[in-house]
Amino acid sequence: MTAASIGAAKGGGYARYLESKTVEPERGDYYLSPDGEPTQAPGQWLASPDTLARLGIEGSSIEGPEFIALMEGRHPRSGEFLRRAGATGGRGGGIDLTFSAPKSVSAVWALGDANQRREMEAAHAAAVSEAMAHLTETVPTVRRRYDGQQVEEHAREVVAAEYRHTTSRGVLAGDGPDPQLHRHVVITNAIREDGKIVAVASRPIFRSAREVGAYYRSALADQLQQRGYAIERGTGKHGRYFEIAGVPRGLLDALSARSREVARAAERFRAQWGRAPERGELRALKLENRKAKVLVTRADLQVVWNETAARFDFAGDKPTRLLGITAEPTPERALEDRVEERLTERAATFEPGEFRAVLLEQSVGELSPREALDLSRAMIAERRVLPLEGGLMTTLAVRAREQAIERRFAGLASDGGRDVGSDARALAGDQAAERIGGRLSAEQAHALEVITGPERGVILVGPAGTGKGVVIDAAARAEQYGGHQTLGIAVSGSTAQRLGQDSPALAGQTLTLDALVSRVERGRLHIDRDTTIYFDEAGMADTDRLDRLTEAVEQTGSKLVAIGDAAQLPSIGAGGMFERLALIAPSAVLSNIRRTLDPDEQRAWSDLRAGRSDRAMAHYHSRGQLHMENTRDEAVEQAAQ
């Protein structure tokens, strides 16, 4: 499912766009009569009879003027505004939710017999209805003020217009539209518990888009299974989707010309700008590379679709043979294990909505959506998933690893007995300072003393530009004077290499975290109590890597100096422990920006790190260092020049 906001200024125009009977814009289902003539195929209102009566709407079929009035924020009969003006003065608009069936469902709809077509349409309609009911029940779609505070609450119901479509757009190359079952559900208003008609709160809907889309697909898979179709789970991007088992993959690709066209446009963008398009840019590419709907007869479309199916041996009665077949069995881990793995692939914590979305995605074809939500509650009750303060969640497995890391680091921090000595520290500090043509500052000297102390686990905190490199260089020199082995590590190879450049005492002795742990585990690298490991940008280590590293350090008796900044880029996987470890172990903090001597520039750097971007931008603007362009692409181009 995708969600798009229709602004107040475009509300009426968008309504006319969906309601138009002309060839160019979309129209209803692009439905054609048997003889190929466009039909009315009106959209349907999704609202209770009482609400429709309040709005002066008779019957469930949408009449153009009624829809246009609601999208403009007006009562369909009186023309009076239904709600207050927003911050920009607008009163109309809405949210367009597009529920698009998997390509195999559209293929069976297009190529199957009349009964299969009806079954696909009915399953799709039921799934959309279930998803909308779930949205109304679980997503707060009303925003109001209490005692000066803005709060979100659930609506009694929403008012929406539903349009049924069965084809995608044609492509610029001239090909006709592919089969693509989808429905636009345009939410125009919400009804508060007190009965007042108000605007829809869009942000909660956008936050819940993945969950509602997953609920729709789960419901659709359940509907299809009830009708005798087998489901193949784990298809599409990140394995979040499903297809009907038995439909040739090559056919699905052949019936996806529009998707290929957008993908080619994205590749051209990547070639020009050296990066993938962001969400807004991708939406613009879709608009730039779309062709108006071309109304051709159903018979014409059927000939093209049948010819395409024949190339993949899926013509004739092949679609009807899908009924009753079984999907190829694939060895899989237990559902709960799969869910936990997906949830913590990229972060140690997650939103409750993401938890439900992942469970719905992973259980497609295995559980109904209601059963999946029951399982989500059971996983919380069994403490496999743990609610945290602030509304986030984590898994018991991740928390257990975090606790193991904290326990190990606390042990390292309390294990003393090896100190490089004040003489070695002073000599190393002088040599490192001489290399940069100056002296160590008071906070740098203190940091050097802390990280060369007797504890086996210590932390050095400091943002970029505070002179961490010279402190690490001095510390490594001091350790080497005592006959100790020194190694530098980082998550990425480039960071490890830069560590050796910024701290010459570690030159030729740096490697990635993964390489160090792997070599130690396989006996290819020996580390012991006479080894000190300097871990740069430690905040970028995910929990699994940190777990293996601290275990290796604990078992070998070596020393670990973790260096980083809690405000830097986070880990790629589940992580975020650096700040917590700094509370456990002896820590030194570098806060003075040494990259510039200008106090105003130093304050601007500190403001950026602390999230006070308005202050930093004001400073850069006052210095003429802030340059504005109309678009992101123009800004990138000017920066490159």
Predicted feature residues:
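Intrinsically disordered, flexible peripheral segments
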Residues: 1-338, 343-344, 351-360
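Interdomain "pre-motor" coupling segment immediately N-terminal to P-loop NTPase/helicase cores
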Residues: 357-426
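Short hydrophobic/aromatic beta-strand immediately N-terminal to the Walker A/P-loop
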Residues: 458-461, 561
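Walker A/P-loop nucleotide-binding motif
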Residues: 460-470
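Hydrophobic positions on the alpha1 helix immediately C-terminal to the Walker A/P-loop
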Residues: 471, 475
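Conserved P-loop NTPase motor core of helicases/translocases
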Residues: 478-555, 580-581, 591-596, 600-627
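Structural recognition of the conserved hydrophobic beta-strand(s) that form the central parallel beta-sheet
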Residues: 488, 559-565, 589
